[in-house]
Amino acid sequence: HHDDIPLGIMPYINFQVSKPNNELHFSVLTSGFNAVTNAYVIKSLYNTLDFITAGEVQMLQMENYFEAGFNDWWGKDVSHFLDGVSEKNQYEKERGLAHRLVRIVTEIYHPKSEEEVVEKIKEIIVDLEETYPGSVNSPDVQKLKGMIREFEEELVWGHYGIPVSNVHHLRLGFYKGKIFTEQPEKNRDIVPILDQFRQYQPTMISLVMDPEGSGPDTHYKVLQAIAGAVKEWSKEKDLSHVKIMGYRNVWFRYHPAEADIIVPVTLNDLHILQNSFEESYITQVDASFPSYEYDGTFSDVAQKTWVNQMRQIQLVLGKDYFIFNKSHLLKATHGMIYTKMLTVNQFIEIAEQLESIMEGITEIGDL
């Protein structure tokens, strides 16, 4: 899901990005449109109309924009927005978002002129203004909302120079605009993941692994879809070298005894998390009640979790272990991330056990 990776293992990503031989790919399996409010889209589309009227979306004047040009240089929108971040220029950030929204509208609705773009944006605004908050949007509006979240994901990894070609948006079909979504299906939800494994040949796969019986939510269904793809991939080649990293973020935590690898978190890591989250996940900064434990942003909740986990480790090792450590990294550590490293067989076994538990819960609920 969008923002799960940074909220779970951003400091570990910081370490991996620094290795020049690593090739990183970030796959977001769900559209995430449910997390984008009508009010946010309305405001952003009004801003986009203002930029078009002021002649500030020059790409609309490209000779072949409406035929194919709109589909070129999606990464320019990311660079444009992040230039605004570096300059602390809100106007340019909003203009960068406007460029992306114009591309999105062009891809979904296929307008043939600037005038048709403007008319379509106005139609979407009217539709959303007449829609009761929380009701199910049309498939086109769901796609538009989802593509806004996809832009956010490209922004956060753009901080590292990761190109948009390495940020993959799978939009798996089980994720729908309903409270209870469908179970993953092989051809619809598992094969797209398997195709990515075949193409990129990863040696490490990371995902959220929430505890057993935590509920048939998005994390659980994504886990089952990934497990299905890994299982199919294991039939095609030897995966003994592949590692699966499980992590948790703002909803659940590992007990220290469950963790196989504990990642140190520095103040620099915390700054990167906070800044990139607030500047990238623009629809989520004001998310209501992200946690029952803390009334703040998701990134605040993640930071609080990592700091609390540091205190747990200090109870075992003592504060002096870090204060007087010869390692600059450990001396600078102010948080900890717990992760679980698994072989492919271990991961598949855990997924199957979790599936059996959930089937049992469903059967009890049907009694």
Feature locations, PLM:
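A generic structural motif
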Residues: 20-24
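Short, glycine-rich nucleotide/cofactor-binding loops
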Residues: 1-7
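Metal-dependent de-N-acetylase/amidase catalytic core
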Residues: 8, 15-16, 26-367
